A protein has these predicted regions:
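Hydrophobic transmembrane alpha-helices and immediately adjacent juxtamembrane helices
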Residues: 1-241
Length: 241
């Protein structure tokens, strides 16, 4: 419960006070992206250590080893539900309600995220058994991955600057999922903000990806991740861990 609140306090101070980005309803925007990111990163961090940390159990009792990293995803899912309560609380406090068809993006994005995360958790768990530095390299990789994913900054800023390379940005499955969560929970692509003095400014926050394209992207993530998970489970079962 404290993790998303701590993130919120730090990033709100940096981006709203120090950098003065003026992003409207920043807590809602930040938490909607953190929901997806924390589920992904926490699952991988725990999944990478799952087999190694349970070495005594693995050597004494036979059971499908893939249960261990997949259980890490399940544990992170419990945290996801807790953090969802925090987000709902902030939305209620800000009287920020989002209704409409965009909410249907959440189950599609969540399914894709769980499949992708499960496949990746199996991969890093297997690698960490053979190469113990994997969990340390994973920490660095997740740090880079975090900043390649539009959690704390408006995706519209990146979208406007990369032009022909936008397809590379959307090739990041976690970015696609985060965009789905933000479109569903944060809502509008370009909110209009009225500043002091009556000046009206339109701030572009979310990348202008059409709802249809976003659905196709999330569908592709789900299908591709399902194939990855099947292959990962098969490969994991053939190894003697």
């Amino acid at each position: 419960m404290l993790n998303p609140i701590l993130y919120l306090a730090v990033f709100s101070l940096v981006f709203s006070v120090v950098l003065r980005n003026g992003l409207p309803h920043f807590p809602v925007y930040l938490l909607s992206g953190l929901l997806a990111w924390n589920l992904f990163s926490t699952s991988l961090a725990m999944g990478a250590r799952s087999v190694v940390d349970n070495a005594n159990l693995v050597t004494k009792v036979y059971f499908p080893r893939e249960i261990l990293p997949l259980a890490s995803v399940g544990a992170a899912g419990v945290d996801f539900l807790t953090q969802s309560i925090v987000l709902v609380g902030f939305m209620a406090a800000f009287r920020y309600g989002v209704l409409g068809w965009n909410l249907l993006l959440i189950p599609l994005a969540l399914v894709g995220l769980l499949l992708f995360t499960s496949a990746f958790a199996l991969l890093v768990a297997a690698l960490n058994v053979q190469y113990r530095d994997t969990q340390h390299l994973l920490t660095l990789a997740l740090l880079v991955w975090f900043w390649l994913t539009p959690v704390v900054y408006p995706s519209a800023l990146v979208w406007a600057g990369i032009h022909r390379f936008r397809f590379l940005y959307l090739a990041n499955p976690v970015a696609d999922v985060v965009l789905g969560f933000q479109r569903a929970l944060y809502g509008v692509v370009s909110p209009t903000v009225v500043h002091q003095g009556g000046k009206v400014t339109t701030i572009h926050v979310l990348a202008p990806v059409s709802l249809g394209w976003l659905v196709m992207l999330l569908g592709a993530v789900a299908v591709g991740s399902a194939v990855m998970l099947g292959l990962a489970c098969w490969r994991f079962s053939t190894k003697d861990y």
